[in-house]
Amino acid sequence: THRNGHVEAPAHTHSRITIRNKKELEQVHICLGVPSHSLSHEDRYACHILNTILGGGMSSRLFQNIRERQGLVYAIFSGLNSYRDTGCLSIYAGTSLETAEKVVDLVIEEFRNLKKQPVDPEELRRAKDHLKGSLMLSLESTSSRMSNLARQELYFGKYFSLDEMTSKIEEVTADEVQRLAHTFFDTRQIALTVLGNLDGFKITRERLDCN
């Protein structure tokens, strides 16, 4: 809803599987994405916590389980992009052709795990501390503070202090994170793009089943 009361429907796209053979690429580049909430949605802080737990740093599930423990990727992370009317939660992984299918399977497994059971208190605590630390660092410079003020005025018409934002982060519960996982991680909503020297590589929608 805009400030003048006009309501626009959220943008809608089709969730496709795109496979592109690029022989010049040394790695296989994998990107999965699901729709998420808008920048002003009431669950925006829980969205950031979910992203942090999934792939937002070296202590995240994707990094620890797929890169550190199994060594299947060169890099892996998730990111949250939020706009006025919609958003996108995306996961990137760089790997080899031999391990590409396994990496996709393990990402889908993490989707399932986040849906199956609430995050434990220790992991939730780490995610909150990480997110608050990142927020504080992002507002250290004058230019970043001015950008934050402008963004808040554009999207909210008001200013949220650092204390207000950190308090909202603290209010996020494990049940809220699990609820968002159920909302976002729907097999029908997952978009997948794979680029690389793929040599006949194929993947089906059934392989993305996270229910």
Which residues does each predicted region cover?
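Non-catalytic beta-strand/loop surface segments
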Residues: 1-41, 52-105, 123, 144, ...
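Charged substrate- and nucleic-acid-binding regions of tRNA-handling and nucleotidyl-transfer enzymes
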Residues: 156, 178-179, 188-195
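A short, acidic, flexible beta-alpha connecting loop/helix-capping segment that sits on the rim
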Residues: 195-201
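Double-stranded RNA-binding/processing signature
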Residues: 44
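Short acidic/His-enriched helical or mixed secondary-structure segments at domain edges of catalytic enzymes
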Residues: 68-69, 73, 114-167
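C-terminal subdomains that position terminal phosphate/3'-OH groups for nucleotidyl transfer/ligation
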Residues: 111
